[in-house]
Regions:
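Conserved GNAT acetyl-CoA-binding A-motif
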Residues: 100-112
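A short beta-loop-alpha structural element at the N-terminal edge
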Residues: 3-17
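Conserved beta-strand in the GNAT
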Residues: 59, 64-80
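Conserved acetyl-CoA pyrophosphate-binding loop and the N-cap/start of the following alpha-helix
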Residues: 85-97
């Protein structure tokens, strides 16, 4: 698919930027943990963490990396798009690629992340009965599976 490619080491900084901005936008309102979201969860800390999974990362790059996806063993582990570009179709393209080219069939979404659940639902994923706690929290994750 056009503009989607395997991540390279030089993408690590941009991937980390997108990840940190998306975490703050989507998860800070739920968890409200200042020390984590504005202290330890920094771009410089995420660069190395993402490089460890470079073989599982794909980026949407049309000259600038605008989104990324992590897929492993049929599971979508992460899918984030630069916040100011959300709603432009980049996430849908990454998700389609994950399903068609990487055989992605399921994911775990934070139960309170209604925006993410609605996005995946629009693209053929359904919430199952399976739930588990997000590690180290009292918030639930719900399992979503491709229903097509």
């Amino acid at each position: 698919m056009r503009h989607i490619r395997r991540a390279q080491p030089e993408d690590a900084n941009r991937i980390a930027e997108i990840e940190v901005f998306c975490y703050r936008l989507n998860f800070y309102p739920i968890f409200r943990e200042d020390a984590f979201y504005f202290g330890e969860f920094q771009v410089t800390n995420r660069i190395g963490a993402n490089q460890e999974h470079l073989d599982e990362l794909l980026v949407y790059d049309d000259g600038v990396v605008k989104g990324f996806l992590r897929v492993a063993d049929g599971e979508i582990k992460k899918l984030f798009v630069e916040p100011v570009l959300q709603g432009s179709g980049i996430g849908a393209k990454l998700l389609k690629y994950a399903v068609e080219q990487e055989n992605a069939r399921f994911l775990w979404a934070l139960e309170k992340n209604e925006k993410a659940i609605a996005f995946y639902h629009r693209h053929g994923f359904r919430v199952t009965e399976e739930r588990k706690f997000e590690e180290g929290t009292t918030e639930y994750l719900v399992r979503m599976e491709l229903s097509r």
